[in-house]
């Protein structure tokens, strides 16, 4: 049986991570002709507060903090290249910005 792996993990391992870490986000980074993937846990308020505070003085350190705190597993190319880490975290944060919500009176 040839099962598709994501960041070297099979479906069972990913389900176990979901149980342990909560909601997971898969990010794909296109670089040249290759697609690299990273699995993040959703950032918490604590993660976002730290990023916001750090980003006021150094935006790249803020992105690095999110990567370090939220990464679960990444393809080797992302792990070894800061540019790809930045793109992966940027996609993670953009996902939060694209999430919509609505409030209305009851």
Named regions from a protein language model:
Residues 28-106:
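Short, surface-exposed, charged amphipathic helix/loop patches that serve as local interaction elements
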